[in-house]
Amino acid sequence: MKYGRALAALCFICLLCACTGPSVRYKHKVIGDMQSHNFEAAQARIKNAQKTYGRRDASLYYLDLSAQQDSINYSTNTLTLLTEAENRQEALYAKSISQKMASFIINGYTEPYRLKYFEMGYLFFYKILAYLQEKNLQDALVETRTMVFFLDKLRENTGKDDPFLQYFASQLFLMWGAYSDARICKENAENAYINFADSYAKMPAKVQFTEEDRNKGLLTVQHLNGMIPFLISQKTMVAWNRFGFAIGTTNGYETVDQNVLTAALAGAYGDAIAVALPKVQEVPYEVKGSRLLVNGITVAETTLVSNLTYLFKKNFDEEYNKILITSAVRAATKFLITKSAQNGMNKKDNTVGSITDIILTSLFTATENADTRSWFTLPAQIREANVLIEEGKHEIKLQLLDEDNKVLDEHLWKDVQINRGRHTYLYVRTAK
């Protein structure tokens, strides 16, 4: 009776924890909406899927919803969404032991999602952009200092940094006359760009002011382009030789014979267990560059200043061994629980023990999923152009270019006010 109650309780827990969040199909549909530049449809789809995020990952829901904004279709609730996501991330530091244990036994989804270091950095970036769109310079400065503090701690604790965010902060500090802070951030940006040279991102050329430019203002256009990769779950059956599990191949694991796999999936092979590992899924995009026009005249081409695809892959590679070990520990825990329950049942009836083995093996196989959560609506890259423009209202156009510099589309801002000696920011989100 004792083992029967334990088995029933364990099965119930598994079913409760089997939720895996938004599906791959859902993500593809949202991405499709964004690639068609139909951000209203993407927002509606995300809102309809709020329950699939659950309370546990509400921060990702708010982030995916907020990432549909730019200077053309900016919504006043963007700051509310971003602030809610930030507050929920801060609350995650009070994590219970029971959640941690469940993540070992069931799957990684039992714990709330904590943003990766680069995702947290770009949460600050999006909030600053929102403040700039609302012309709330004071709060934009406060958020910039918060972002820089985060980057400083990140560098001290891990040696990591984000060159673009440091550069972005330096430009904002210049805007407010905080020259010492601007100099420090610029130096950090230069060092970080050197360390991330293989990302192909670089700092934009410095805008040179001359005596003739005294009646001009600085315009910065940021082009948030493409879609960052996301993760999918790959499930494999691993054979156990008395608690040994084979790790080989360049992928960090090896699958067993197909006959064993088939039997294990049927719950009939007691010494095999499901292990799910994440895999990077890239999202192709056509736009490879962009060109800035002011009043119909070409003035600049954008520079790749941040490669978020690179950051995503680099972070995944750095975490893969940890993911692999966690998956192995979880698989071992499931294996031991299954065998313990089976042995307990065998003391009363061998047939019941065999059935217990089949039930638990099948149940653990069904609930085994890799943690594939991420802020999947982030751009793949950020491009930037800076140009000095005479004071007054201007027509600003950004042409989207393919790899052969053919114009695929364009985005227009009418009557953009440029003020003498001031810095104006515009940003556009494209995904095609």
Write out the residue ranges for each language-model feature.
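TPR-repeat structural position
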Residues: 39-40, 75, 82, 137, ...
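Bacterial Sec signal peptide processing site at the extreme N-terminus
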Residues: 15-41, 48-50
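Boundary/linker segments of alpha-helical solenoid repeat arrays
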Residues: 54-59, 88-99, 153-160, 190-208
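TPR/TPR-like (Sel1-like) alpha-helical repeat modules
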Residues: 79-90, 145-149, 172-197
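Start-of-helix signal in alpha-solenoid helical-repeat scaffolds, especially tetratricopeptide repeats
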Residues: 23, 56-59, 113-121, 161-163
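Short loop/turn and low-complexity linker motifs enriched in small/turn-promoting residues
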Residues: 208, 214-432
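"A position-specific structural signal for the A-helix of alpha-solenoid helical repeats
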Residues: 28-29, 63-64, 68, 119-129, ...
